[in-house]
Structures are given as structure tokens and as C-alpha cells.
Amino acid sequence: MSGLVYVLNGPNLNLLGKRQPHIYGHETLADVERDCRALGKELGLEIRFHQSNREYELIDWIHEARETAAGIVMNPAAFTHTSVAILDALNTFEGTVIEVHISNVHKREEFRHHSFVSKRADGVIAGFGTQGYLLGLRRVAKLLDEAKG
């Protein structure tokens, strides 16, 4: 398996930096992508970075990742709480899955406390802002290094 990692972003994350900055901060998704690519290069990971407001596109990328990727770092956003379909897709992926949330979902509305994705995730990172993506990439890289021996 290669050092390829998919970084997948769910609905409304295209508005990062503009939507509720008091919760999600002022960094844009382009900033997150830039930082993920820079860290990926440092760690020897190839990054495929995607965002969609459509559930089926996220599922298609998960299916694509099955063939070549070592890991998925995913911020499913609102699909976290609703999507059995994304859970089912992730259950077909054999690599590492890290679930990321920019805000601490457990300090927010009750409905945000439930995650279908967590049922498959190898780890969950929440409340560290966009740094959570970088923590997720570091974890995938560490697991890859450990698997190499």
C-alpha cells in the first residue's frame, strides 16, 4: 500500500472561514489544503484533497481510496450525524480512517454528539481547529511507519 491519503471534507466546509467563524475559525478550506499538502510532503505522504456537499461524491471517493490509499482523514461535517451510507462505504476500506471535527462537537448541540463515522474510525480528533487535520495525517503516517517495521 502506498503513502496515499485521502483528505475528505463534507458539506458546507467550502464556506470555511466565512461560515460561523466564531465556531470554525477564519482559515479557509484552501488554507487547510495548503497545510495538509505541506505536511504530507514532509511526511512522505501523497495527499488527495476533496470537498463536496453531495453525499454520493464522498462515497465515490471512499470507494476510489479502497484501491490505492493507505488512509482517509475525513471531516464528514453534518453527514457525521446522518449518513449510514458513508459508514457503509468506510466499512469497505481496509486502511486507517481518522475522523476530524474542527469544533468540539461534544460542547455543542445534542444532535452533534452522535457519529455514524466513529463506528468505523480508528481515531477521532475534535476541537483543535483545523490543526486536527494535521494531527490526523501525523497519525496515519505513524501507523504506516510502524507497519513497515
From Swiss-Prot:
Substrate binds at N75, H81, D88, I102, S103, R112. Transmembrane segments: none annotated. It comes from the Bacteria. The keyword Amino-acid biosynthesis applies. It catalyses: 3-dehydroquinate = 3-dehydroshikimate + H2O. The record marks R19 as: Transition state stabilizer. One of its GO terms (biological process) is aromatic amino acid family biosynthetic process. The keyword Phosphoprotein does not apply. One of its GO terms (molecular function) is 3-dehydroquinate dehydratase activity. CDD domains: DHQase_II. Its EC number is 4.2.1.10. Keywords: Amino-acid biosynthesis, Aromatic amino acid biosynthesis, Lyase. Pathway: Metabolic intermediate biosynthesis; chorismate biosynthesis; chorismate from D-erythrose 4-phosphate and phosphoenolpyruvate: step 3/7. SUPFAM superfamilies: Type II 3-dehydroquinate dehydratase. InterPro entries: DHquinase_II, DHquinase_II_CS, DHquinase_II_sf. The active site is at Y24 (proton acceptor), H101 (proton donor). NCBIfam families: aroQ (TIGR01088), PRK05395.1-2 (NF003805), PRK05395.1-3 (NF003806), PRK05395.1-4 (NF003807). Homododecamer. Belongs to the type-II 3-dehydroquinase family. Catalyzes a trans-dehydration via an enolate intermediate. This is 3-dehydroquinate dehydratase 2. The gene is aroQ2.
